[in-house]
């Protein structure tokens, strides 16, 4: 018989930046539903937190990324509202998940600046904007189902996005980078993505480094003690109609351990600054005790 884990994780002392991030993630949950701020407003706040203003950006291709990012945030919000009104918005892959990933990605990008001495400010700014765009769109068109083939949903997201990126004036090179990064969010790619940056000087101008930040942002709310129980319950609900057996495993000791040990990987300097491995390892120890 499966052993189920408590939905009330023990309190954990968090580093100050992590505690601040958790506070903002919890504010999202308080707003979710009747007081929801909307993805476009959140997207603007992420740019503000990074100090990126379209009217002060010098590069035309970066301006295009910002415009497309904000436009798609509005479009995704509008589409999701229609889904929600028809009770069709996925339980996990909802606007709340995208908001989580945007907030976590913003924090990782901000902290990553401390670990880079790259003098090319404009290139870093461009990559940060691309990172936010991928955080917003990595699950574009997700219907709440499970991959039946490797990369099935990720490929579909790219196919749906390419025309929108083209219409948004995104360069061919950046369209390719966005799709590469989305394809690398496929779960079977994650461990290799992290291996690829071993012994590298971490630099988000390197696609492999930016990829790791996106992977970390994607699952961070499912690791943090104040948010993971709700995230796990939402994913189980979403998967219930597609694969009841897998859904039932998520909140068991075995299921949680498997996720923490195999999927919840953190290797960027920014994630180390947030203490994410310590948080994860503490929970693993508690589950094994």
Label the model's feature ranges.
Residues 70-104, 141-146:
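Active-site flanking loop/helix segments enriched in acidic
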Residues 47-75:
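Eukaryote-specific, low-hydrophobicity, charge-rich regions
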Residues 101, 127-145, 157, 180-186:
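His-Asp-centered metal-binding catalytic motifs of divalent-metal-dependent phosphohydrolases/nucleases
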Residues 2-56, 92, 104-126, 137, ...:
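Divalent metal-dependent phosphate-bond-processing catalytic cores, especially two-metal-ion Mg2+/Mn2+ enzymes
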Residues 69-81, 131-135, 178-186, 213-217:
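Short alpha-helical scaffolding segments that buttress acidic/His motifs in well-ordered protein cores
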Residues 159-174:
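Post-HExxH zinc-binding segment in Zn-dependent metallohydrolases
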Residues 98, 150-158:
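Amphipathic alpha-helical segments in well-structured domains
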Residues 152, 173-177:
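Alpha-helix N-cap and coil->helix boundary residues
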